Each structure stands twice: as structure tokens, then as C-alpha cells.
């Protein structure tokens, strides 16, 4: 591992690291916020997954999460949104390829060689964080848009791994919206049954009651993508039918930007702290 940056921040440290990923077959970068030490108890971790076109720095520089994370004693880990590099397959569109990994394991050429973000987030990155930093094994997950989709599927596919999950303006039903259809067709092929494994609504309908974890979703009602790409009401209906403990908050006047995330990130951190710090 190589440290790229380090900054003092709210008595803790904001760092950026590069490492060689055996899962993704390329170098990867992640950011981490380490809160000031409180006692001898290792702090829990909140993983944050960003959206289309983003990297590990968007949340770090725009969300303003460090102050509350420092107060609560929560480590923040921000991975990149895809594998990257000259040898990594890409596309001219902003919504496919580098910066648009969709947090799944691709099965189709040319994507399958590198695009295994699901395995990276489930196994390699947490193991690296555990081995290199003083953290506990308690973790939660959150994200925005494509990253909200990522956070939800990570939680739904890995019962017991996370204490809680939250999302801002998530893509909840990718099998049925343009962003998801484009990405899944390329990464997973035309067999739509294979898509269901990566769709939060399908996963929630297939879930077991004992695996449900506290879930918080915020959605701005002035989000330009609300009607055609996001459709949180579809997941809310799945949660209602499954009696899944999910709160969906529609926030009047807010859009899809980091101004929206910055406005409510404190709520999300305090929500996760209830379960992470038990």
C-alpha cells in the first residue's frame, strides 16, 4: 500500500491510499477518515459507495461527514466506483465502464477481466482495512445513486455483515430503468434472470425476515432522475410487503447533488451509530 495524501481533519486524519487489487487486476485507490482515538476500543467502519462518474474523493471533499464521524468515533472508508487504468475496458458514455462499475461482478467480455467490484467490496477491501488499520469488525454501508444501489445490494446479499444500511437517491430497481438496463446488458449479458441477483427490489422480495436490518433512504423530490431512474416507491412497496424495517424520507426541494447529501449526512451517520456502537 502507498499513501497518496494525508490531512489533519477534526482531530483525526483524512488519508488516501493506493494498493494493487488482485480481485480487479489493477491498482485501486480508496480514501479513509480515521477519527481521533477515544479509548482502547477499535472504532467501527462505515463504507460509502459513490455514484456515476465519481471516484473516492467526491464524498471526502463535498459531503462534510468528517466532523460528525469524528464526534461519533466512526471510520469512513470510500472506495472508487470502478476499476481503472489504460488496460481496463471503458466506454464513451458516462454511465458505463470506468466510473460506472455498478458494484457487481461482470460476466461478459470485455468487462469480466476487471469489473468485479462486488467481490472487491465484500472481501478484498474489508480485509485490507482490517489488516492495515485499527478498526473493529462492526460495519455499516451507505451510498448515493449508483452507490445507493451498491449499498443496498451489498446489505441484501450478505446477511449479518452490516449492522445497518442507508442510501441517498438510490437506483433501487435497475432491471427496469435505463441506467440499469444499459449497464446490466453490457456487464451481465441479455439473460434478465441473471440481472435479478443485482436488483435491490428482487433481492428484498427474496429475503428472509430474520435477515432484515435497519434501512434509511433519503430522496429529494426535485431530483431530475426521480421518475425515470430511481423510483424509490418500488422498493418501499417491497419493504412494506416484507415488513422490512425501512424508512423512506422524501425531502422537499432537494435535487440529486452533493448539496442534498451534505444536508442530511449527519442524520445518516447518527442513524448508523445507533447500531454500530451497540
From Swiss-Prot:
Induction pattern: Constitutively expressed.
Consequence when changing residue 223 to A: Loss of activity
Mutagenesis / variant outcome for changing residue 145 to A: Loss of activity
GO-annotated cellular components: cytosol; protein-containing complex
Recorded catalytic activity of this chain's protein: S-formylglutathione + H2O = formate + glutathione + H(+)
Protein keywords: Hydrolase, Serine esterase
Gene Ontology molecular-function annotations: carboxylic ester hydrolase activity; hydroxyacylglutathione hydrolase activity; identical protein binding; S-formylglutathione hydrolase activity
Signal peptide start and end residues: none
Active site per database record: 145 (charge relay system), 223 (charge relay system), 256 (charge relay system)
UniProt record similarity statement: Belongs to the esterase D family.
UniProt name for this protein: S-formylglutathione hydrolase YeiG
Gene name tied to this protein: yeiG
